[in-house]
Every structure is written in C-alpha cells, then in structure tokens.
Amino acid sequence: MFKIYETELAGRKLTIETGKFAMQANGSVVVRYGETTVMTNVTAAKEAQDDIDFFPLSVDYEEKLYSVGKIPGSYNRREGKPADSAVLISRAIDRPIRPLFPSDFRNNVVIVNTVLSDDQENSPEVCAQIGTSAALAISDIPWGGPSAAVAVGYVDDKIIINPNCEQRAKSRMKATVAGTKEKITMIEAGADNISNEIMLEAIKAAHVEIKKMCEFIQTMRDEIGKPKFEYKSFSVNPEYFERVCNELTEEMTNAVKETDKITRNENVDKVSEKIKNIAIEMFGENAEEEHKFDIATAIHDLQKKCVRSIILNEHIRPDGRAIDEVRKLTAEVDLIPRVHGSALFSRGQTQVLTIATLGTKADAQSLDGIDFDTEVKRYMHQYNFPSYSVGEAKPSRGAGRREIGHGALAEKALVPMLPSEEEFPYTIRLVSEVLESNGSTSQASICGSTLALMAAGVPIKEPVAGISTGLITDLEDSSKYIVITDIQDIEDFFGDMDFKVGGTGTGITAIQVDIKNDGLTYEIIKEAFEKTQEARKMIINDVILKAIPETRKEVSKYAPKIIAMTINPEKIKDVIGSGGKVINKIIDETGVKIDIDDDGKVAIYCDDIENAKKAQKIIESIVKEYEVGEICEGTVSRIAKFGAFVDLGGNNEGLVHISKISNKRIEKVEDVLAVGDTVKVRISEIDDQGKISLSMKEFETITDTEKEEKED
C-alpha cells in the first residue's frame, strides 16, 4: 500500500514514501528533501551463512549522474566504480546501523542507496542515512533501530543543522552525526581547528534533530512495519563455553598480558589449542569440523572477556600500560633519498612511512561527481595497508574501502593547516605505507603526514597529531566504563569504540568514531575529547617538534621550482597567442611548464629556477602595460617607407614614424636604421586600440662632423 509520511527537518520539509517502488525488496523507501531524492532498498538472505564468524552486511551508496542531468564521460557512458566520496558515505551509513543488528545474526543483508536527484542544496547523504533506517525499520529484517543522522556546520559562530550549499562553503565544520533516541552512534567530521566545547555542542544540537527523526521513523514502523522474521541464532554452546571459562580464563588472561604482539598471539594460539581439545573431549574427534563455529566463538569470547576484565577490574592494559598511557613513540624524517619529503612515525608496534611529493597544478586531482562544479584537489593523502604489516602472506588487491576511509581521515586532518595556493602553489600528494600494525595506523598516518609535510618544506600553519581512545563498558552496568587512550589492536577488537581524533594542541581537525555497543553518552564523548587533546599536545611537543622543530625553508632540490605571478586577465590571450603559438614558444625556449587561471594567476614550473625566471621575464614583457612618456629599449624588427617598427619585447611592437627618427630630415629610413639595430625610444602615444607610437628624436647623438658644421 502506497503511503507518504511527512515531517520537518532543520526547517525544511522531508517526506518518506513507501509502497510504490521495488516491491520485492524486504524494505523500500524514497526520501525527498527539497528536490533531493534518494531511494533506499534493503534485502536479506533467507538462510544464514554457516561458514562465517561475522555479520555479512553490505552497504552501497550510488551516485547516478542523471540525478544532476549529466552523462558519464566514460567510453560506454556508464557510471564506473564508486568514487571515493561515495565509498566514504557508504561507510558512514554502515557504521551507525551495524551495531543495532542482533549479535548472533548471520544472514546476508544488502542495502542500496540510489541518488535519483540532487538539488545541490539538501544533502543526499542525510537522505540516505534516514532512508536506510526507515527501510530497515519497516522491513521484516531483525534490527534494533531506528536511528537517524544529520549534517552539521559551523558558520559565523553558529551551529547549523543540514547547512545548504552556500553555508557549507563558508562552514568551519563539515560533520555527520548519527544516533538513536538515547545515544550517539557515529561521528564523522572535518573541522578548522574547532574547540572541544564547540564540537560537543554541535553533537548535542544534532542529537535534538536525530531524536525527532527517530520518533518519526518509529511512527512509520508502528503503522506499517512488517513482523521481523525468525533467524538461525549463532551463539556458542553454553555448556562448552562455561567449561572453557572455568578451565582456561586464568591462562588466557596471562596469555593476553603481553607487550609484544607476536608473543601474545603465540600465547593465545597455545590456549586456543586447549580450547579445541575441550571441544574434542565434549563432542568427539570430529569436533574441529562439526563444531568449528563453537570453537572459534569460544576463542574469541574468552579473549574478549579477559581483555575487558583486565582493564575494568585491574585498571591496567593488557600490555601493562596505565589507562591513559601512550605507547612508546619515535619519529624520524629524511629517511628516503630523492623523494621530496619523508617521515617514519612509530607508536609501539605500529609503524607508518609517509612520503610527500610536490607537483604542478596539472597534477591536481579532478573529481567529477554529482556536484555541478568539478572539484579539484591540490592535496591528496593515500593510505596503503599491505598484508606484511600484520605478518600475513596475502596478495595485494589495491585500495579497499578501509584504505580509502583511513586515507580520507588523515587527509581531512591536515587540510585546515595547509597554506593557501597563493602562498604555496604546489599540488601535494602524501602516501602512507603501513609497515607494521598493532592498531591506530590511521592516527600514525596523521602524525607521519605532519612530519613529511614539514620535511618537504610545506609551510603548514600548525603541527597536527592523531590519537584514538577506546571504551570498555561493564556489560552488567553500562554506567560503569573506562575510556582508554591510544588503543592497540585487541583493545579495538574487543572494546566498545574506536574514537579517532586528529587536531592541533588546541583544536580538532578530524573525527571518526566507530562503535560496537548501542551508542555513546555525552559524558563519554566529552571525556574522549579531553583525553585525545592531552595526548595530541604530548605527541606534538615531545615527538614531532623534536624530530623536526620547524618547516624546512626550501623545498627539496628534486622538487619542481615554482614562480607564481598574477597578470591582467585581459592579457591572457596575449600570453597564449593564436593557437597557443606564444606560450608554446616560451615553453620551447625555457623548458618550463606554465599554468594560467582565468583570473590571471600564473604558475611557472621548472627544475631549474633560472629557466623559470627567464620565462617569468618573457611573460612580464608580454603583459607589460606601457605609459606615454615611458623610455624603453627595443630592436628594429622591420622597416617600411613611412617608418620603422621596433620590437619592445614580449610580442609588443611600436612604430617610429620617419619624422620621429631624427631631428634632421631623412629621405629613407634605411639611411639611418637597419633591421636588428638596438634603439632607445620614448612612448609618444597609445591609441584606443593599444597601438604604440614611438619617438627617437630625444636620443639622437650629434656627430663630430655635425658639431663642426654647426660651429662654422
């Protein structure tokens, strides 16, 4: 049955339709916000997957170019693989809804969000977040929502919910906040050094609207929601797990209490063998095959129980650290020859090598998406996580969603601190290679980025560091919890959150929050902000600035040299010339690359600074605007009966009429001048069309013979 539900979000009408599209999906809705329209379809497999130990959820966000009246530029005119921006939105939709599925649910679930139209004012991402929650809520798929999400901006010292296009352009914050009626379930943000206090107020303001949307979706659920289907529960055999806990809890606790990751894994493997042996004793010699799930789950759950117990009850970490203690940190720069900047940042057994490369404007990345204007990125950060970083032997398959997400987080952390294009007219690419991983590699990439940029001579405004906090909550009483600083892999894996924050010592530039429980309270978020800020201050002052106290004064000798200048936009055509004749001649003569913007900004690139200066001089002569009375030097370029044409340089030419060549009467120009002569001239007139008239009379030299004739 076709139904339309209407509400208001941030002062604008939002509608959710269901019962018309995709009727065979488990749940289907169309969300309209202004003229932005997103269709969300959710489907679930009827049978569970027996051979996996995780919940198989897939979330896609599809940006269709027809939504903004564009035709794809590919050969076959089809949309290609999702852009990085679409991947990031898919991840942002996934993270708040995943913890709300039953923990023992193993049916494959696929969620597809399709942008049907985008009015460039109302966020399709917000529509997709709301559509996902609504479609799941009214479907028969087991899920503990509803949840909702809104975008948040900060313009003119005011928090704006779901900012429009104009507000987004001026905003010092670009954040997406998701939550349930009770708690916050996801934060994704980039910000211009925003304080903890303002960020927390923004989250609270977002939650007000989130609560309203959750109530709205719950109304839909109550009216038209399908009964949730029954599913095969995947949970460990209780008698088996009870025996495992009774016999091996102390041994597993000792196994995970280890500083070295490799040794810890070896210890856990030994205990795991004993867990398998208990299964064989209880279920027979085929237990490893027939009770594979029970064994794997028992190993996982016992580790989780022990790690959480150590932190909650002993107030120490599995590796012996205090609750707020950061692992040993080291930083080095200039490790790799010939590259433009390099840095190695290590935090315990997490190690990241970051390389900076400086390029020309032509190296900037064009992002052709559903925005009307093609975005051009002059700063890029890419993150690679090879299997050898965790001691595994797996082939590389290129960047996946996780790599794209971590790279984007480290990228947005540094963007507010970059110099303007006018101040530093380079394209900048950073690549972070994870060499060793024991948690928080994305935050190590942020620190490595700061070091590599400073080593490359990029004049960043302030150093930026990144740190993660984790959460361990008492499963019996959620009001009892501990927020821990600088989480390693097992604390992330068995804990309740990974709260990543990048920023300076005073403010926040990036946030990414993943949770595994039912959400975070304001108190937990506030504590996470405070602890990450203290850790960032320490990392910046005690590690980063000791490795490189200030940004290099000059770029690497291997980096291209750039001269930036600004010309009158009306003169651009003169620099380029007919069919590019003039600019190509400059390039051929000097070996430089030249970029010219429509507003007259010119960038000259060359490995040899002297050649760049030569090209600059030529361009300056081309765009030079002469004034009447100005004295110049030029070369006679051609001769006519009525005068001589003088090349003033830079494709500028003036005429010396025969009457202005000499104070004496001359019959032929050739009697006085020849092509190639260097002459001094004065600008006598410039007409409305820019034609220049010259005079040489003022500079005529009187010869000795003329002096004698004059004296006689």
Predicted regions and their residues:
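Conserved phosphate/anionic-ligand binding catalytic regions in large, soluble enzymes, centered on
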Residues: 27-29, 122-141, 333-356, 438-458, ...
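Flexible, glycine/charged-enriched surface loops at secondary-structure junctions
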Residues: 103-109, 144-146, 213-231, 262-263, ...
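Extended amphipathic alpha-helical scaffolds
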Residues: 1-45, 53, 232-374, 560-574, ...
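Conserved helix-loop functional segments at active or binding sites
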Residues: 95-103, 138, 335, 360-363, ...
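Single-stranded RNA-binding regions, centering on S1/OB-family and related RNA-binding modules
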Residues: 558-564, 569-712
